[in-house]
Each structure stands twice: as C-alpha cells, then as structure tokens.
Amino acid sequence: MTSIIEKPEPNFNSLHDFYLNAAHKIHNPDRAVMFYKEKGKWEQLTYQDILDGVEQLGAYFMELGLQKGDRVALMMDNCPEYYVIDQTIQKLGLVNVSVYPTLTGEETAYIINDSSSKVLFVGNAFLFKKFKKVEGDCATVMKVVVMPKDLEQGEKFTDYTSVLVEGEAFKDKYASAVAERFASVVKSDLSTFIYTSGTTGMPKGVMLTHYNFMSNCYDAKDLCPAITSDDLYLSFLPLSHVFERLATMYLSTYIGAQVAFAENIDKVAQNIQEMRPTLMAAVPRLLERVHDKVYKSATEKGGISAKIFLWALKVGGEARVKRNEEKMVGPLLAMQVAIAEKLVYSKIKAKMGGRLKMFVSGAGALPVHVGEFFANLGMRVQEGYGLSETSPLVTVNEFHRQVYGTVGRVAPRQMVAIQDIETKKILAVQTYDTFEAKYASEEGEILVKGPNVMQGYWNRPEATAEVFDEEGWFHTGDIGKFDRGYLRITDRLKNMLKTSLGKNIYPTQIENVLLRSPKLEQVFIIGDKREFLTAIIHPSMDELKSAFGGRKDYFEVSDPFIQDEEIKKWMQDDVKKLSENLAKFERIKDFIVKREPFSVEAGDMTITLKIKRKVVMEKYADEIEGMYA
C-alpha cells in the first residue's frame, strides 16, 4: 500500500522558533526584515524591532490574564503590526483569529462570538466604526486595541501605541512567566482559526496547529529550492487568508526572506517598481489582468512593435515546449530567444522590477493561456493547489518543470487520492516519492492525508465528520485527476451542473475558455437542472469604451444589465468563436450583459475573487429565468 516516506526536518517546536532562527542564525537581529510605506516614504523594521514589539505585547497580554489557547482576533489590513501581533500570539500559545476586513459587521460579530475571542485588534477608523455597530453582540471581547491613536479610550478601548508603552513597563514583571509560557508551546498546539469565506453558508473556523503550518513550509521549500534567504516578497493579498499567511508570513520567516507590504491593491504596480521583489503570491484573476494589460499595450497600435512582440511570444513558446519535454533548445532557437529577451522580455521584466523569480499562483484555477503567456516571456508562474483545511499547500508545479493547466506535484509529506464520485472506490493514490512524469489517472474527488491537514472545524463536530472518512482521508470537495504526474483540477464538486438532459458540466472550465476573449472580464455559467447553458457576462470596460466610446448611458444608469443589442452582438462574436473549442452541450445558448462587475464589496465574490454561485443565482433569479422563458 502507498504510504508517506518520512522526511528529515528541523527541530522546531513553534512558529516563533522560525522567527528566532531567522533573526539569530540565518541573519542577525540588525538586519531589515520588513518594509512598509508611510507618508510616501518606504520605512523598514529589523528583526530586533519586531522582537522588541513581541516582548512588549507579550507582557501586555500576560497583564490582561490571557491563558494558553485563548483567542485573539485581528481585523486589519496587511501591515507590520499584524506581524508583531501574530508572532506574539504564536510565542504565547494563543490562537490567531483573523477577520477579513471586507466582511460585514454581522459576519465579523459571528466570527468573534464563534471563536470566543477575548481581544480584538482593529486596523483603522473605518473598521472600528464597523465594529462599534455590532459591539453589543460581541460579549466575549474584553479589550479592543485600535491602530490609530485617539479613536476611543476607556476601560475596554485603547490604542496600539499605548499597549506597547504599557507592555514595556510590564516586561520585567512578566519576563519569567513569558519564558515559561513559550517553553510550554509545542507543535501540536493550535496556531490559528481560519474562517472559510466559502461561496455558500456561514463560515467555519478551520483549526490549524503550529505543525500544520510548519510541515507546509518544509514541503514548500523542498518543492522549490530556488527560494532563499536573499529573497524579497511583496505582500498584497490579505493575511487573513491562509494562502498569503503561509506564503508571505511563515514561509518567508522560515527561509529568512524579507517582506515588503504593498500600500494597497491599486498601488501594487507602483510598489513593484519601487521595491523590486523577487517573489509574489497572486490569485489567478490578478494575473489575468496583468496578461490582458501587457498584451493590449503591446499589440493595440499594430505596426512593427506589435509584430516583434508576437514573434517573441512565439519564440518563447517554442522554447518553453522544448524545455518541458526535456529536449535541447537548439542553437538557432537559443539565438532567437536571446534576441527576444533583449527586444521584448527584458522590458516587460523591468516593469515587474527586474528581479522577479516567480509568481506563486493559488486560491483558484489559473487559465492555461495565462500561465503559458508568462512562461513564453521568460517569467515563471508556479501554480499550486490547496485549501484552508490543508494549511494550504497540497501540490505545486516544480521550479524546473511547469505543466500549465495542472497544479503540480504532490508535496513530500502528503498523500493525494482520487475517489470515484459514484462508487467511492479509490482510483489512484500518489505521493511525492511515487511520482512518474507520464502517470495519469481517472477523474474523481481529490482526497488528502498529511501533517498539514486541519484538526477539524471549531465547534462544528458534524461538519468535521462530513469531510473525514473512516480511513482518515480529508475530502476536499474538488474534482480532479493526475496528468503527466501532476494533479489537474477540474472544478469544485458543488459547482458541478447537471443539465436536465443528464450531462455533468463543470462551469469553471467553460468560463476559462470564454475568458480568453479580451472583451470579457467575468463569466458566470448557469445550467443546473436546465436543458441548456446560459451565462451572465461582465465585459471589459476598457475594451467596451474603446469599441463604442464613452457614452454615459452605457455606464451610468440604474439597470444592472446593459440592454444594448449592438454591445451584445460585439461580445457574441467572440463567444461564438471561442465556443468552437467546447462540446456542443457546453456551449451557452444565451447570456445577459452585467453592467457592474461582480465584487467582494457587492457581496457576490469571495476575498480570493471567486464568484459566490448561490448568492448570484438568488440575486439575479428573475433575469436568469428570463433567459429560459
């Protein structure tokens, strides 16, 4: 029977041990570890600066009487303070409960209450105002710490600066108690509750231990030895999400890399130029936008420059295929690649700061053409796969072997199985050590075993029992198969549409085909229990304005859908052409044109930019019915 071969790993007991090792053994305490922008200027913090903050905050927590296992909630955007707070939590054996800043007040109150959080950190005045509206519903919170000074003071409220000042005064008093507490923290202790921002239902608190994350860091480093202590991450995805927490916070700490916090999502391009990162974690939708902008900028004016760009893409594609097939890149092709590098690739890389080794893509399916596009330009996008429940990494494309359309090789400390959806028979089991480059399997639900798999859902024993079987396999709810030795994701099982004619359809695959059109920004496929498929499509506003001009009646009316038949015909041309790549039963018969994009703010997307199917189906039920009338 297939089993996991034990791998050597460092002797660390906690995530705070990672930090101490980086500060004292990989580097020294005076090395800059973190960069952030304040009042238009990039500032830095050293390892010692962070350690000082952890010491002060730790003493403050002890004065509050926090016990091992108590929960501390963080409702804040990415910032150095988040790092200090989290390291203090890990050192004292507390539990980080991160609340997405985009959640409603009611959702925030639900998470605080469900976790019984005793302390809440709030990042800004806007978030504080949101909390104040539901404060009365958060009975377990005994102290609220706000980042800005002078928002509100009192027995229950204070500000972060005051907390550090108080902690400094308590340091000597609690020095031995803090040391004893830290010594008591072990790998199996809880580190965090990650509340899933799923597309259906109330969020569940995923319980992850120190070792869940630690083993995942060991796996990530083993799968990608190219990441080193000289790297600089640019962090812009929310640390509330497990993907960014692992990739930017814990993995960077483990290897001793530096982190720069982007100002916000709109400033990422500017911040890349300023900080010149070597590594970035990104979700597929953001990479799609980069692809669209680069392609449009290079080709829209036509002429010789557009021809050179397209030639460079072609040459890069030929070289990519050769390398993936482990064939020699001949002298003529190598010379063409060198010319393309000088004329095209280097200029695009310079806009990415000039030092970027790779993007790490996760939290959703990366369209094949987007991954290949970056690879053709000599830039790596390493797509991986995981969930909050798996800390998150399960598989990732290896640095030396990229197979776009797959999510890579099984991590060294894990097992992945494929189970038939109907019969529940195990169709395949793979580990890192059983890897074969030509291995393929049938399709089914993806199951996972390993030290990265969660302990369960907080306060939800029934929900926990639903996702673990008698053999200890965690059922991911994702459909996939092995292809060329790597895992390939088809879709979420709950996303599967079954037409009234009995056809099983996975909408994400169809959506990704149609999204190859630069005219289409978002596609949402409909068809469960229907005779045929339809869609809600949001067009690219840049392309729309370019094609039809800036007429206000397209963009500034109350109707959520654009009724103009000329615009629909303009989009239909691309839909029809791209649908030639689909089976007849996968082609949409009709669609409606959504004026505004699906968004997190509107409540119809998750924080990782996945459309919430149930929400959209309910929100636009009448318009959807109209397509089937």
Which residue stretches match the model-derived regions?
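ANL superfamily adenylate-forming
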Residues: 39, 128-187, 294-345
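Conserved AMP-binding A3 loop
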Residues: 44-48, 183, 191-217
